[in-house]
UniProtKB/Swiss-Prot annotation:
Enzyme Commission code: 2.3.3.9
Record-given protein name: Malate synthase
GO BP term (any one): tricarboxylic acid cycle
Transmembrane segments: none
Location(s), subcellular: Cytoplasm
Superkingdom of the source species: Bacteria
Presence of keyword Transferase: yes
Length: 541
């Protein structure tokens, strides 16, 4: 069933609450008057503060674009140097050695919960294209998953259901910047963050507690401890409204923006009643590095395949994250292995799996307490590495007091080369992912990697950076608009020969090309691809 399918008119809800999206009868399972009144209360209490924090982002970015650089905040020095820890974690969050992530699609939810991972992060954010149907059905799917009743029968007759032993569920709502235009509160679109969090929490928190677990979340894209403070206040109100003890909610924050890396202690402190640690978000972090320092000619990056977690600013922030979390007695989660198994080519598959092993070995030896994978086929590989080197449930006792990371290390640019193939790869991947996203898919296998929105962001950001600063390729040529547009035309021809029109739809592919070209060649850097892409998604309804 899709957004465009015939539907009935949405029912009337409470004062000021309007559902503008299409309506299917089963939407009433989660879009109840009580649930929408709950999210309306969140919106009325926190909506203006959210918008003010988004305005603050613009002000801070303007200063960086004029030459200022991110730094540790002098006004929060006492927090960084203080002797405090976060609240104790529940039993089912002590061992998180392997976590799998994926969209809220019904079959994928079942497969991820059955994957053998310790945790499944169900994603309303980067792995989900936020069509109205995807958003609402994702909530239905998770409600059924929490109750153990979720099942799915594919067109070929294959039946999917939950195993008795399954992963602990986390949910990632959308970031603070994303609106949800299909629900208005007092004439304004609700925050996607508050809707995703609010609906899930309202329908499932008590049920999860009754089943011996709890409402656990991943929080994305934050840029400051003030944004973490907002989440903490949301949690307080939500728990009070449902009569659930304060501190029941636990949340892991993704450190996937450069500014947040300078405020990790502060973010943990703001969420200290609710914290379940921090996580390294690689692709978005690289994207944020480019965005934050967009005017600085000294930070033009090499091909993104050369910007790896063992290099320069990425290595520095991952080490500092471990030290910070363990000092506060909470988990430091490693990053994503986005590789997917390669069928029909044993040698290529072995090479990819060796890369995964090396990445996970680096993480566990550095002191991470767990790691992410994007495909069930990688769960066992990641688990074997962590089992061999992490004998207890976690490594919180490894305080990494040897780590000495300052502002210079967090801003250090890795050495490497820029190539025409690197440019073309960004074009191919960015356009294909965006085309799939416009077609309602947020999690897309491309060139043996499971890609999400962070991939499209880093692709267009890097192309913009190279063009904007006239970066030199390894053969001496400058990256110009002409070079980019010539490559774009040739890559579109290649994609069409490879069947991209049939795979994604000709209209989606063309919209993706236009959007990618606009963002890559704009005079100013667009904050998020997903904002104009959401406009395009809505325009085709």
């Amino acid at each position: 069933m899709s957004d465009q399918a015939p539907s009935v008119k949405p029912p009337a809800f409470g004062p000021g609450v309007v559902v503008k999206g299409t309506w299917h009868p089963d939407y009433a399972e989660v879009l109840t008057p009580e649930a929408l009144e709950f999210v309306a209360k969140l919106a009325r209490n926190f909506g203006e503060r959210r918008l003010a924090l988004l305005e603050r982002r613009k002000t801070v970015q303007a200063a960086w674009s004029k030459g200022a650089r991110p730094h540790f905040l002098p006004e929060t020095k006492a927090v960084r140097e203080g002797d405090w820890t976060v609240a104790p974690l529940p039993a089912d969050l002590q061992d998180r050695r392997v976590e799998i992530t994926g969209p809220v699609d019904r079959k994928m939810v079942i497969n991820a919960l059955n994957s053998g991972a310790n945790v499944f992060m169900a994603d309303f954010e980067d792995a989900n294209s936020p069509t109205w149907d995807n958003v609402v059905r994702g909530q239905i799917n998770l409600r059924d998953a929490v109750r153990g009743t979720i099942s799915f029968t594919a067109e070929n007759g294959k039946h999917y259901a939950l195993n008795p032993k399954r992963a602990v569920l986390f949910v990632r709502p959308r970031g603070w910047h994303l609106p949800e235009r299909h629900i208005e509160i007092d004439g304004k679109p609700i925050s996607g963050s508050l809707l995703d969090f609010g609906l899930f929490f309202f329908h499932n928190a008590r049920e999860q507690l009754a089943r011996g677990t709890g409402p656990y979340f991943y929080l994305p894209k934050m840029q400051s401890h003030l944004e973490a403070r907002l989440w903490n206040d949301v949690f307080h109100l939500a728990q009070a409204e449902l009569g659930i003890p304060r501190g029941t909610i636990k949340a892991t924050v993704l450190i996937e923006t450069l500014p947040a890396a300078f405020e990790m202690d502060e973010i943990l402190y703001e969420l200290r009643e609710h914290s379940a640690g921090l996580n390294c978000g690689r692709w978005d972090y690289i994207f944020s590095f480019i965005k934050t320092l967009q005017s600085d000619t000294r930070v033009v990056l090499p091909d993104r395949g050369q910007v790896t977690m063992d290099k320069a600013f990425l290595n520095a922030y991952s080490q500092l994250l471990i030290q910070t979390c363990h000092r506060r007695n909470v988990h430091a989660m490693g990053g994503m292995a986005a590789f997917i198994p390669i069928k029909g080519d044993a040698a290529a598959n072995d090479a990819v799996m060796d890369k995964v092993r090396a990445d996970k070995l680096r993480e566990v030896k550095n002191g991470h307490d767990g790691t992410w994978v994007a495909h069930p086929g990688l769960v066992e590989i990641a688990r074997d590495i962590f089992d061999s080197h992490m004998k207890g449930p976690n490594q919180l006792s490894n305080k990494r007091e040897d780590v000495k990371i300052g502002e210079a290390e967090l801003l250090k640019v890795p050495s490497g080369t820029r190539t025409e193939e690197g440019l073309r790869h960004n074009i191919r991947v960015g356009i294909q992912y965006t085309a799939a996203w416009l077609g309602g898919l947020g999690c897309v296998p491309l060139y043996n990697l499971m890609e999400d929105a962070a991939t499209a962001e880093i692709s267009r950001a890097q192309v913009w950076q190279w063009i904007h600063h006239g970066a030199s390729l390894e053969d001496g040529r400058k990256v110009t608009l002409t070079l980019f547009r010539d490559a774009l035309g040739e890559e579109m021809g290649r994609l069409e020969k490879e069947g991209a029109k049939e795979r994604y739809g000709a209209a989606h592919l063309e919209r993706a090309r236009v959007l990618f070209e606009q963002l890559s060649t704009a005079g100013t850097f667009e904050d998020f691809l997903t904002l104009p892409a959401y406009d395009a998604l809505e325009a085709q309804r």
